[in-house]
UniProtKB/Swiss-Prot annotation:
It comes from Bos taurus. The keyword Phosphoprotein applies. The lineage of its organism: Eukaryota, Metazoa, Chordata, Craniata, Vertebrata. Residues 190-211 are annotated as: Disordered. This is Claudin-7. Belongs to the claudin family. GO terms for biological process: bicellular tight junction assembly; cell adhesion. The keyword rRNA-binding does not apply.
């Protein structure tokens, strides 16, 4: 039968990773202005996220502007946004399903085998959520690297990795690991066999027979 400690560890890791994915999706620091070469900006720092771009002054004040048009955004940014939204929705669904299937909860009935299968289903959904987020962050990171080493892109508009993309990678890893631990909670074949009555063997005939 599934180990409740393993289930709790996997669920905690997956939930923590999902919270990290929510945070990285919301904050605008997916890429930040580069300081390579002669592109040294001391008065302000520029950030770009999935939904807005921001400028932070040397005084600490930040001003942000939402993207005006969805159709004018690059294809990589639109795909990243879509994958992150899918990841968050799957993570929310996986949290609900896994909670019902964990041994330490009273949801999902008293059938331990059924609850273990529900927890395994939640783990699989967590894995799908982690994969979607990992693909999104890696795709976005690849685009940053391509633009950084593109000689046609001026130095004053080059960007580097921001904190959000590292949070996304870490969150994806936690969600994947947590989902894998939850998926290992599937009951073994011994739990499916159920109770078997002991076999009864015929008693040996006695040496003497009485009439």
């Amino acid at each position: 039968m599934a180990n409740s400690g393993l289930q709790l560890l996997g669920f905690s890791m997956a939930l923590l990773g999902w919270v990290g994915l929510v945070a990285c999706t919301a904050i605008p620091q997916w890429q930040m202005s580069s300081y390579a070469g002669d592109n040294i900006i001391t008065a302000q720092a520029m950030y770009k996220g999935l939904w807005m771009d921001c400028v932070t002054q040397s005084t600490g004040m930040m001003s942000c502007k939402m993207y005006d048009s969805v159709l004018s955004l690059p294809a990589a940014l639109q795909a990243t946004r879509a994958l992150m939204v899918v990841s968050l929705v799957l993570g929310f669904l996986a949290t609900f399903v896994a909670t019902m299937g964990m041994k330490c909860t009273n949801c999902g009935g008293d059938d331990k085998v059924k609850k273990a299968r529900i927890a395994m289903t939640g783990g699989i959904i967590f894995i799908l959520a982690g994969l979607a987020a990992l693909i999104a962050c890696s795709w976005y990171g690849h685009q940053i690297v391509s633009d950084f080493y593109n000689p046609l892109v001026p130095m004053n508009v080059k960007y580097e990795f921001g904190p959000a993309i590292f949070i996304g990678w870490a969150g994806s890893a936690l969600v994947l690991l947590g989902g894998a631990l939850l998926s290992c909670s599937c009951p073994g074949s011994e739990s499916k066999a159920g109770y078997r009555a002991p076999r009864s063997y015929p008693k040996p005939n006695s040496a003497k027979e009485y009439v």
